[in-house]
Amino acid sequence: KVAFTFFIDPGRRVYVRRINITGNDRTRDEVIRREFRQMEGAWHSTKHINNSKQRVDRLGYFNSVNVETPAVANKTDQVDINIKVEERPTGAIMFGAGYSDRQGIILNASVSQNNIFGTGNFFSLDANRGAINETYSVSFTNPYFTVNGLSLGFDAYKRVLDTRKLQTFGEFKTDTIGAGIRVGVPIAENDIVSLGLAAENTAIDVFGNSPQRYRDFVTEFGRTTNNFPFTISWARDRRDSAIWPTSGTTHRLFGEVSVPGGDLNYYKASYHQKWYFPITDFFTLHINTEFGYGDGYSGKDLP
């Protein structure tokens, strides 16, 4: 007969007293703190601290994110978390001009900011104008519209394509204007499901030498069409960094369907995946895969 006596020493729990953030001259503290999964006053968790560091790094606002956990003076069961960030430029203002024999002078301008006033909100404004092409768009996204991470975004756009000025075979003109709203719902630590609904109006002018596919479109749907595309997507981001990823993956599954009541009946689906594999300290292998499918329904073709 053999008897065993087990003695278990659970050790001492270590708590996080305070989280200190430095280096964020523009970005507000709350933008960084809301990405932390390690809470003040909670038990110290290496897993939660590493996860928090990755989430802050994936924001794309910082060149570097460093985390230290020094012990609190005269305390054996408490530590502080010191996070030091180095901010990077998150906005851009661009102006451009070009020239081609067919389109003549082409002008473009854009303003974008991924971190407006340090709030973490995104805004962009784009304008492009040429002899045959005009595009204008504005976009805004609040990634934390609610405290639990529900995002809200708006988009508006106008696109004009007029090939008559090319003075070549196949003249037509399209004029599209639209606007939409987007909502993102986090369903897991690295997973987000997004829903969107837009309304757009497209006018098509065809002429004597217009391509047959545009003539067929106007014959089937009319010169002016109204469309209400509903979109749904799932995205997963497990990269180690948004700026310079060296490992991890991203996945995106996207679907779009025209809502009944509009002039178009179609659906589209696509899947996009990226892999990152570290080869050396200076080289990373990047593999990209993408495929999609679309068709019409209710007896109509995919436009």
Regions of interest found by a model, annotated:
Residues 186-191, 279-285:
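Secondary-structure transition into beta-strands, especially the periplasmic turns and strand N-termini
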Residues 4-14, 25:
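Extended, domain-scale alpha-helical bundle/helix-rich regions
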Residues 79, 284-303:
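Extracytoplasmic gating/loop element in the C-terminal half of outer-membrane beta-barrel translocons
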Residues 21, 32, 84-87:
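Periplasmic plug
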Residues 196, 252, 286-290:
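Outer-envelope exported proteins of Gram-negative bacteria
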Residues 26, 42-244, 249-250:
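Gram-negative/organellar outer-membrane beta-barrel architecture
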Residues 26-41:
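N-terminal periplasmic "start-of-domain" segments of outer-membrane beta-barrel proteins
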Residues 263-267:
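Extracytoplasmic assembly/pore-lining segments of large envelope/extracellular complexes
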